[in-house]
Amino acid sequence: MPLLDSFTVDHTRMNAPAVRVAKHMSTPKGDAITVFDLRFCAPNKDILSERGIHTLEHLFAGFMRDHLNGSNVEIIDISPMGCRTGFYMSLIGEPTERQVADAWLAAMEDVLKVVEQSEIPELNEYQCGTYEMHSLEQAQDIARNIIAAGVSVNRNDDLKLSDEILGNL
């Protein structure tokens, strides 16, 4: 099985909260696609609650689009990581890590403005596979933690696993 890009970086050295360009690619027509690792918490040290990350999934996707989409950027998808330490965001365009970090912080401010759980988008059995597994309170706790900590940048060159380490795994 091929080694995926996300497993060539040293998770023991990742900062969080932090933005990382996980991958750059181009479509056959030359459009730039960028995948970002939006690391909410340090791998193997902390984890996002299942209800909190699920509620963030519903809120974060729309709020990030509000703050980042524009003439040169269009978000394709924002999905939670299976390890529950963050989200991957795929988009058309090449915004800077700082632009993404600023949009992320603004989106977290938006999460704090949601007053009632009933305001969570698509919170029903027709549009959500586990619509009862949500917690606005937990999502807002996560948002407060991100705002308090600020968002830094993780760079692939700083996190790259050596061929020797990869060969021994």
Curated annotation (Swiss-Prot):
Enzyme Commission number(s): 4.4.1.21
Keywords assigned: Autoinducer synthesis, Iron, Lyase, Metal-binding, Quorum sensing
Q: Can the keyword Lyase be found in this entry's annotation?
A: yes
For molecular function, the Gene Ontology terms on record are:
iron ion binding; S-ribosylhomocysteine lyase activity
Q: What does this protein do?
A: Involved in the synthesis of autoinducer 2 (AI-2) which is secreted by bacteria and is used to communicate both the cell density and the metabolic potential of the environment. The regulation of gene expression in response to changes in cell density is called quorum sensing. Catalyzes the transformation of S-ribosylhomocysteine (RHC) to homocysteine (HC) and 4,5-dihydroxy-2,3-pentadione (DPD).
Q: Which HAMAP family match?
A: LuxS (MF_00091)
- This protein's name: S-ribosylhomocysteine lyase
Organism expressing this protein natively: Shewanella baltica (strain OS155 / ATCC BAA-1091)
Q: What is the lineage of its organism?
A: Bacteria, Pseudomonadati, Pseudomonadota, Gammaproteobacteria, Alteromonadales
Q: Name the gene behind this protein.
A: luxS
